[in-house]
């Protein structure tokens, strides 16, 4: 058996077409959606991510602003800029690209963003709302994974789901969204004693560790859906995920490739969250 590929690129194009239509409708009413992106420092990966986010806004009818600062920017100046963006009616979403330089407290920065503009879904108010099942924004990567599972009609109610990784950005919110969908969820991490004992019983596995080959064929239940959130480089410098793709695709029922799987969905869901924020604001001021 060879797994069916979950095509994140194709799904993201469909969702972006919907975003563009909604953005056009808002703009026609004088409410063009706007995303502010802030980059501090010169991390090469962050520069690529930010460039892709700004381009995605432009391509789909969203306005965007891009503030780029040197790595030695004082924390107080960054917080002051966030305060300005919070009060700017043209901006519906604020994204501060992580990681930040060591002298800047990322928690303080995230908490400075107005919850109604926190389109990454990282603010403590939004994290708490996610816990209670009433999120204002769902974090982009887990939200994208849920859209993929739904698009391929992978059943979650009553399913055993394993999330490998416990980060605030992916692992924890991923587990909560799967739980909300009716799955029985296990979170595994670096201290888990026997990872394979958990994954072999899973109908759905989401790997989000940043470790190559954390999931291999003998660890996967035949027919399972395997979602690879990882972004790594192999020995030849080629982009790869956390999953041993060549081996696992011969056992799994569904699998996401890297690249072309979860990656395109993350930016797409950022656009979706920004559109939702703009629609919410337009409705409140109608």
UniProtKB/Swiss-Prot annotation:
GO cellular component: cytosol
Biological process terms in GO annotation: L-histidine biosynthetic process; methionine biosynthetic process; purine nucleotide biosynthetic process; tetrahydrofolate interconversion
Coiled coil: none
UniProtKB keywords: Amino-acid biosynthesis, Histidine biosynthesis, Hydrolase, Methionine biosynthesis, Multifunctional enzyme, NADP, One-carbon metabolism, Oxidoreductase, Purine biosynthesis
EC number: 1.5.1.5, 3.5.4.9
Annotated pathway: One-carbon metabolism; tetrahydrofolate interconversion
Stated role: Catalyzes the oxidation of 5,10-methylenetetrahydrofolate to 5,10-methenyltetrahydrofolate and then the hydrolysis of 5,10-methenyltetrahydrofolate to 10-formyltetrahydrofolate.
Similarity-based family: Belongs to the tetrahydrofolate dehydrogenase/cyclohydrolase family.
Name used for this protein in its record: Bifunctional protein FolD
Native source organism of the sequence: Paraburkholderia phytofirmans (strain DSM 17436 / LMG 22146 / PsJN) (Burkholderia phytofirmans)
Annotated gene: folD
């Amino acid at each position: 058996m060879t797994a069916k590929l979950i095509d994140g690129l194709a799904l993201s194009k469909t969702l972006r077409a919907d975003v563009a239509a909604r953005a056009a409708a808002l703009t026609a009413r004088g409410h063009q959606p706007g995303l502010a992106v802030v980059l501090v420092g010169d991390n090469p990966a962050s520069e690529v991510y930010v460039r892709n986010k700004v381009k995605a806004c432009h391509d789909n009818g969203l306005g965007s602003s891009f503030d780029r600062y040197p790595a030695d920017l004082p924390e107080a100046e960054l917080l002051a800029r966030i305060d300005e963006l919070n009060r700017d009616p043209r901006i519906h979403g604020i994204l501060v690209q992580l990681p930040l330089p060591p002298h800047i407290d990322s928690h303080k920065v995230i908490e400075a963003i107005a919850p109604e503009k926190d389109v990454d879904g990282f603010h403590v108010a939004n994290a708490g709302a996610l816990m209670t099942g009433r999120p204002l924004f769902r974090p982009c990567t887990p939200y994208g994974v849920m859209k993929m599972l739904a698009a391929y009609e992978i059943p979650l109610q009553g399913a055993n789901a394993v999330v490998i990784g416990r980060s605030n950005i992916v692992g924890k919110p991923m587990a909560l969204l799967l739980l909300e969908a009716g799955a029985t969820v296990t979170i595994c991490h670096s201290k888990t004693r026997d990872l394979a004992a958990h994954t072999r019983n899973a109908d759905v596995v989401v790997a989000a560790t940043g470790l190559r080959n954390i999931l291999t064929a003998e660890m996967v239940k035949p027919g399972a859906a395997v979602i690879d959130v990882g972004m790594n480089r192999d020995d030849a410098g080629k982009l790869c995920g956390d999953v041993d793709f060549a081996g696992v695709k011969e056992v799994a029922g569904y699998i996401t490739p890297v690249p072309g799987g979860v990656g395109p969905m993350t930016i797409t869901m950022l656009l979706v969250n920004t559109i939702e924020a703009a629609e919410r604001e337009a409705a409140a001021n109608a």
